[in-house]
Amino acid sequence: MAEKRKYSRKYCKYTEAKVDFIDYKDTALLKHALSERFKIMPRRLTGTSKKHQEMVEIAIKRARHVALIPYIVDRKEVVTNPFEGL
């Protein structure tokens, strides 16, 4: 019989760091919630809590609006580290 995989419990990085407010100008905090194509990653992949996920989404949308991070990247321009040029 096949062995069951033991998954490690995901935890919220923002709760562990005791972050009360996520600022849209702090791109270092936002990079954990973005994929390599600058898409917002869901909670089930990042492990963030519902409260912090909502704050992250709002901060990312504000950062996109003021052009701190791009809305989307072409497939040809995908880089391994999206925050290298920022």
UniProtKB/Swiss-Prot annotation:
GO terms for cellular component: cytosolic small ribosomal subunit. It comes from the Bacteria. Gene3D superfamilies: Ribosomal protein S18. One of its GO terms (biological process) is translation. GO terms for molecular function: small ribosomal subunit rRNA binding; structural constituent of ribosome. Coiled coil: none annotated. HAMAP family: Ribosomal_bS18 (MF_00270). Part of the 30S ribosomal subunit. Forms a tight heterodimer with protein bS6. Belongs to the bacterial ribosomal protein bS18 family. Binds as a heterodimer with protein bS6 to the central domain of the 16S rRNA, where it helps stabilize the platform of the 30S subunit. This is Small ribosomal subunit protein bS18.
